[in-house]
Amino acid sequence: MDPRKSIDKPPHHDPILGVSSRWSVSSKDNKEVTFGDLGSKRIRHGSAGADSEMLSMSQKEIKDEDARLIYINDPDRTNERFEFTGNSIKTAKYSVFTFLPRNLFEQFHRVAYIYFLVIAVLNQLPQLAVFGRGASIMPLAFVLLVSAIKDAYEDFRRHRSDRVENNRLALVFEDHQFREKKWKHIRVGEVIKVQSNQTLPCDMVLLATSDPTGVVYVQTTNLDGESNLKTRYAKQETLLKAADMESFNGFIKCEKPNRNIYGFQANMEIDGRRLSLGPSNIILRGCELKNTAWALGVVVYAGGETKAMLNNSGAPSKRSRLETRMNLEIILLSLFLIVLCTIAAATAAVWLRTHRDDLDTILFYRRKDYSERPGGKNYKYYGWGWEIFFTFFMAVIVYQIMIPISLYISMELVRIGQAYFMTNDDQMYDESSDSSFQCRALNINEDLGQIKYLFSDKTGTLTDNKMEFQCACIEGVDYSDREPADSEHPGYSIEVDGIILKPKMRVRVDPVLLQLTKTGKATEEAKRANEFFLSLAACNTIVPIVSNTSDPNVKLVDYQGESPDEQALVYAAAAYGFLLIERTSGHIVINVRGETQRFNVLGLHEFDSDRKRMSVILGCPDMSVKLFVKGADSSMFGVMDESYGGVIHETKIQLHAYSSDGLRTLVVGMRELNDSEFEQWHSSFEAASTALIGRAGLLRKVAGNIETNLRIVGATAIEDKLQRGVPEAIESLRIAGIKVWVLTGDKQETAISIGFSSRLLTRNMRQIVINSNSLDSCRRSLEEANASIASNDESDNVALIIDGTSLIYVLDNDLEDVLFQVACKCSAILCCRVAPFQKAGIVALVKNRTSDMTLAIGDGANDVSMIQMADVGVGISGQEGRQAVMASDFAMGQFRFLVPLLLVHGHWNYQRMGYMILYNFYRNAVFVLILFWYVLFTCYTLTTAITEWSSVLYSVIYTAIPTIIIGILDKDLGRQTLLDHPQLYGVGQRAEGYSTTLFWYTMIDTIWQSAAIFFIPMFAYWGSTIDTSSLGDLWTIAAVVVVNLHLAMDVIRWNWITHAAIWGSIVAACICVIVIDVIPTLPGYWAIFQVGKTWMFWFCLLAIVVTSLLPRFAIKFLVEYYRPSDVRIAREAEKLGTFRESQPVGVEMNLIQDPPRR
């Protein structure tokens, strides 16, 4: 038996009567009120979602040309006039016929691929052919094939998922009954029936539910990740008509499809009557029906037009800073390539001029055919000018791998490997929410190692967002006795028909206040206390859900809602005897100290960030109409009746004290409405609710007009505890050189208190507070702060605290530069009373004025713009849904995971990727320069001693795998060393792992090594009878050995995979050379066997290795000995074990690490 059903309720009715019959009162113990002229009025959700950055068409204005008509239960008529999409979804990108052209088109968006395609095409021309036509295409074809296979596999999985989704079954009203129909065949305008625990196949407007009041409960986990149940309502006018679907006539005029899952704006016309529809009347695809037997609705959006599919766009695309910097070096390499080609062409021109009379017989340019073969033809010679032209482009073809085509695919593979290890890091797994780290943007892993500015939300990011009611101020009197003894209070419960109901969560109570509520309304003080807790129980959107316990006679009331603050306040009201036990579309039921009372909900203005408050108008059991309002003090005190000035003053004093303790505060007010006020509000509310143009603005205006002259009832104080490990994490990040900005909507006192508890602020910091109400005042405060910091030279101990009002003048005027100058000199920045759009503005302010990397982290929808504005966005999968996660590049469960993410994985990723890019430049340039040196000894022609297949396989097989393995597995320092010494993170901030200087050092080393590889065999075999193919094999093997040993010299942590990759590549290169030389049709037939059996071959190989790498080894040794880097010092300390014996420079991070996952 459901205790909610045991509460006596009148049968449902919705008469349209005169204004005179406003009330009726029933039994003494179960008081109820019905409003004859209004019926059992459903809850209206007005003034919702007014955040400017979150507004879409559904919450702004809708014009007739932007509307669409849906005829209820008439899909033929609906789809005849409008070409609506079907309900079939398609997340797959390709089909069998479009895969090849579309995939190639997408891949060739990379300019490098176009470059190699042009090279391959040039090689097909007879005048420019250097390599075999097949061999020249192979590198590009290999890269394209690998990417195509990966894309095809991913798309196959999408196709399979689409088929499963589209073939699910739903009940659709057809031919006078509900029939099963595949989801993909559902059309707009059809009426569908969804049963309990089923998932909705489309977006539908509710017509009726199994609950006679029209309420339905849905879970939106699949849509936004929130597990709390939400209520949606069918219109009272459609409940009775839905019983006879055959005669149901009407249409819906709604906005066109949009992505805003929190907004919907439409009108319904039935029997000539116009009804307004809002977000509370629509259920979206992906939602799951809960605690409701069935629901009927009409399809308004289907398939790709549903809000769920429109939001299925994934994380935003960003490019890493390292890859952007890499493009500069690629341009430099391109210029270097042009220089080499120009040198080859110019020297060839000089040589041709000098030897123009010998071209008939001289080697490489012989024009005459002296063979005695029949039909012999002279060699083609195109003349001096054309030969120079062709030489240049032939050089481009020969030296093409100077631009490393394999680098792109290598970077992708390395990032996938890095993401795998980040995702499976047990120390970034949150047991409380059972959530692992998510890497949603693979292409910016290395940016995690270069963060300089961190912008963090507070609520839900630094704190748990699990609110606990702490104390209250009623009529200016503080009730904050929070002695531990109070925790032994058994908690409030009621008995209904032998069933005990009690709140699911217990709240510590103030004994004085508890005793006051027990006295009823015996005194004025007790009356105000009762009004206060009645306000908390009634002024909200919480849904009470009754759940079973192990004791069949005891049931728990669980309060589900979208706001943790509201949940805490309703639980507090229940603890003091005001137990909310039922909410429907038109009324709420509250048990007040054993007496069940029913309140008709006449109207509800939900919270929005413009008003910063919410209000509800109730028809009370005493036949009065009362307005209850709660909101932020900044918005509430301005609408209070000034005659209560003394109470307001005392309340402000208590609010300041609460905020100084780090508590979140709200102010509660109320007033009774007379008949004329109510009727005036009701007519305005009805007009605004049914408006299709500017509805949100009209509702805000209606709310603002009624929310005036309030009597202050009291204020609440809620504690939002810091997440575990936040203080240690912030201190480590600051030691790492990361400037932490905390952006919060809380009061300044609350924000400062949290700043101290989180170690963002310290007691020895000098605080610069800027609270300005004008542009001139703001400018003067900033200039004084700038001068003060510059004169005292104490930037390391200065904290800047600025409020949202001041930021309005800063962000909208020319003060951004001044604020940036001040902030750069401060070690901590705290912004309070900040609106969501200001968060993004602050990030943009810093991002546009520095080349340093920025990271933003948050957990709610109000953090989305900030997350997307920053170079790196991190979402917390917390209590406020998944909007932040869906907009982020990385997602995790707790703020403290930023420490291992940045200081460990970020450092590793940056170091590895920077080294890998430089190494790829080096290994390709070595090979190209060997080919270039050879040109100088072949009359400046573009012939090569190295076989074309070795040229192709060099960057694909011979040297590619080791660099990928090192990029994924190598670690320059251990995890604990990086955590214990956050200063080591500065390596990335200072770009020590990759820079233009390092690039030029690498190129100088490349020139030396290529010269050693080429000239040692050249001079060793000078004057001998060795053929060019044998010499080419020696150069190939020497190059592979040298570049792999070069890599081996830089490996820090060896394992069997690293050994297999490096030494295996050398062995694989030798095997490939042997296989190529045993093919009779190739020019180097048996060459390796001829040269490999001589002692000179092995001597040259040894001499090349020593000569190439000895200078590098010596310089590296001297630099590390005389000018060691921080990383080198830390590495040596690791080897010697001195870190374990000494005190860490940073803070001990063991306290903020999760235990390994089981």
From Swiss-Prot:
Residues 1-100, 151-329, 410-914, 969-998, 1051-1056, 1116-1158 are cytoplasmic. It is found in: Endoplasmic reticulum membrane; Cell membrane. The active site is at residue 457. The chain crosses the membrane at residues 101-122, 128-150, 330-351, 392-409, 915-934, 949-968, 999-1020, 1028-1050, 1057-1077, 1091-1115. Involved in transport of phospholipids. Contributes to transmembrane flipping of lipids. Has activity with phosphatidylserine and with a much lower efficiency with phosphatidylethanolamine, but not with phosphatidylcholine. Signal peptide: none annotated. It is a multi-pass membrane protein. It comes from the Eukaryota. SUPFAM superfamilies: Calcium ATPase, transduction domain A, Calcium ATPase, transmembrane domain M, HAD-like, Metal cation-transporting ATPase, ATP-binding domain N. Expressed in roots, flowers, anthers, leaves, vascular tissues and stems. Keywords: ATP-binding, Cell membrane, Endoplasmic reticulum, Magnesium, Membrane, Metal-binding, Nucleotide-binding, Translocase, Transmembrane, Transmembrane helix. Residues 1-15 have a biased composition (Basic and acidic residues). Residues 1-30 are annotated as: Disordered. One of its GO terms (biological process) is phospholipid transport. Residues 123-127, 352-391, 935-948, 1021-1027, 1078-1090 are extracellular. It catalyses: ATP + H2O + phospholipidSide 1 = ADP + phosphate + phospholipidSide 2. One of its GO terms (cellular component) is plasma membrane. Its EC number is 7.6.2.1. This is Phospholipid-transporting ATPase 1. Its main location: endoplasmic reticulum. One of its GO terms (molecular function) is magnesium ion binding. Knockdown mutants are cold sensitive.
